[in-house]
Amino acid sequence: MDRIVEIEKVSFESEYEVTLRPLTFEEYIGQEKIKSNLKVFIKAAKKRLESLDHVLFYGPPGLGKTTLAHIIANEMGANIKISSAPMIEKSGDLAAILTNLEEGDVLFIDEIHRLSPAIEEVLYSAMEDFRLDIIIGSGPAAQTIKIDIPKFTLIGATTRAGMISAPLRDRFGMQFRLQFYTDNELARIISIAASKLGKNSTKEASLEIAKRSRGTPRIALRLLKRIRDFAEVSDENSISKDRAKSSLDSLGVNDLGFDEMDLKYLDILVGSKRALGLSTIAAALSEDEGTVEDVIEPYLLSNGYIERTAKGRILSFKSYSVFGITPPMHITEEKQNKGLFNE
């Protein structure tokens, strides 16, 4: 699926994102409660001359989990080693990573929910006792070799917290769910990023981009980069609201942040006039269920455009109202009943 509002990280963006990445909590915009708590925990760990307890970040992609990991390492004065679960295929792969860590290092594992059970088993003793238990051989002749490793901080990131096994999840002393960003927070991020890219973005332009960025910094920065291209081709030194609007319209992103895939998803529900299961929607979109559930639906759910029910996905009353469609009778009655209880 090729979308300008795609949330997953695109390979060519890695270097681009690094140049715009904040290095401290003061530079990091948004996630205020998480930042506040982390500041306390980091200060306490440094005061005790200890490594920070293990941290788990979860939530939709593109909200800053990797950036927060880098900031934690920076605030702790530690080196950070980056890996991802799909790259750790064997116990030996994990052992090689852990034995090469230095005292106080931060190990960041992205997509940690994809670790195999065998890898998780090795990780348990490493997280709790800073020791590797390596089994040599098999059967009655098998032996366990214990290897001490430096004390370190594991930071795990996942978009699917429910897929992490309970034993692994319980070993993270700190667990934080990242929230979608407000338009004002995104507008500030966009203005700062535009300056770093050599373009001034007016307050109105930044807010226009923010409104169409689905509450996600990664999308906001991607849209900004494309709008900058339009501005440069037109020899414009700054990004105005009109430039932002026309560029976003050209990119097929409407004023609600919807692209063609979102509209197709919603159109499927409109046409069905009943609840649809995830597999049915995925088949209609020609996408896998994981992409629909992790990439398309989070924004629609968090903003109240769709609802999950026991029977499946349905359009919310808000969607019928936004798109000027008369809702089915049962939706109208449900809305009226909610209103009675809220009075």
Swiss-Prot record:
Q: Using the UniProt annotation, give all residue ranges assigned to the region (Small ATPAse domain (RuvB-S)).
A: 182-252
Q: What is this protein called?
A: Holliday junction branch migration complex subunit RuvB
Q: Enumerate the CDD domains for this protein.
A: AAA
Which positions make up the signal peptide?
none
Q: What is this enzyme's catalytic activity, as reactions?
A: ATP + H2O = ADP + phosphate + H(+)
Which residues does the annotated region (Head domain (RuvB-H)) include?
255-343
Protein residues bound to DNA: R308, R313
Localization annotation: Cytoplasm
Region (Large ATPase domain (RuvB-L)) spans which residues? Answer: 1-181
Name the principal localization, coarsely classed: cytoplasm
GO BP: any one term: DNA recombination
Task: Kindly report, in one word, the top-level EC class recorded for this enzyme.
Answer: hydrolase
Q: Where does Mg(2+) bind?
A: T66
A single Gene Ontology CC annotation of this entry is:
cytoplasm
